[in-house]
């Protein structure tokens, strides 16, 4: 039976334990997700408190991290999502806010022009990030946001 949290505290506490264990054991997000059948993005988001994990996956990652049975149960609990209550001052997260501030109206206009009136789902959604070489030197981040379009329906 699925259970859910009504506060962020349980998952935030577990996230701290996950991060401590990951650091102490020198693990990577990709290594934690390996063999689970889920993407590294989904498993990372779950371990950072944003998604529940299926029981078998929760057991695998908890074992890799050295976490107890209570952690396995909490990893399966539906979290209270969205832990950013205001604009983060973390430079990496802030850049995403900045991208939306600069390009948000452009994205909205292009989505509506190409799809009509509606939204892009963050529920039926996939996220991917890849590091690629920049032909001008250095590296670039290619971030793919793949969400189902959901049209508004008159009623």
From Swiss-Prot:
User: Zinc-finger among the record's keywords?
Assistant: no
Q: According to its UniProt record, which reaction does this protein catalyse?
A: cyanate + hydrogencarbonate + 3 H(+) = NH4(+) + 2 CO2
SUPFAM superfamilies named among the record's database cross-references? Cyanase C-terminal domain, lambda repressor-like DNA-binding domains
Q: Which UniProt keywords apply?
A: Lyase
Q: Name one GO biological process term.
A: cyanate metabolic process
Q: Where is the active site?
A: 95, 98, 121
Q: Identify the EC number(s).
A: 4.2.1.104
Instruction: Report which superkingdom the organism of origin falls in.
Output: Bacteria
Q: Which Pfam families match?
A: Cyanate_lyase (PF02560), CYNS_N (PF21291)
* SMART domains with a match to the protein in the record: Cyanate_lyase
Q: What InterPro entries is this protein classified in? A: Cyanase, Cyanate_lyase_C, Cyanate_lyase_C_sf, CYNS_N, Lambda_DNA-bd_dom_sf
Q: Name the Gene Ontology molecular function terms of this record.
A: cyanate hydratase activity; DNA binding
Please report which protein family the annotation says this sequence is part of.
Belongs to the cyanase family.
Its function? Catalyzes the reaction of cyanate with bicarbonate to produce ammonia and carbon dioxide.
Task: Indicate what this protein is called per its UniProt record.
Answer: Cyanate hydratase
Organism whose genome encodes this protein: Pseudomonas savastanoi pv. phaseolicola (strain 1448A / Race 6) (Pseudomonas syringae pv. phaseolicola (strain 1448A / Race 6))
Q: Which gene encodes it?
A: cynS
């Amino acid at each position: 039976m699925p259970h859910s949290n009504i506060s962020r505290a349980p998952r935030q506490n577990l996230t701290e334990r996950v991060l401590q264990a990951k650091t102490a054991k020198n693990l990577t997000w990709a290594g934690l997700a390996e063999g689970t059948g889920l993407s590294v993005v989904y498993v990372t988001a779950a371990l950072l408190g944003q998604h529940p994990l299926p029981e078998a996956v929760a057991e695998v990652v908890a074992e890799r991290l050295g976490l107890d049975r209570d952690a396995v149960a909490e990893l399966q609990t539906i979290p209270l999502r969205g832990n950013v209550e205001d604009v983060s001052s973390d430079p990496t997260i802030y850049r995403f806010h900045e991208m939306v501030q600069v390009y948000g109206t452009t994205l909205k206009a292009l989505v509506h022009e190409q799809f009509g009136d509606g939204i892009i789902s963050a529920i039926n959604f996939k996220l991917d990030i890849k590091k690629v070489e920049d032909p001008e030197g250095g590296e670039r981040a290619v971030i793919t946001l793949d969400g189902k379009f959901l049209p508004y329906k008159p009623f």
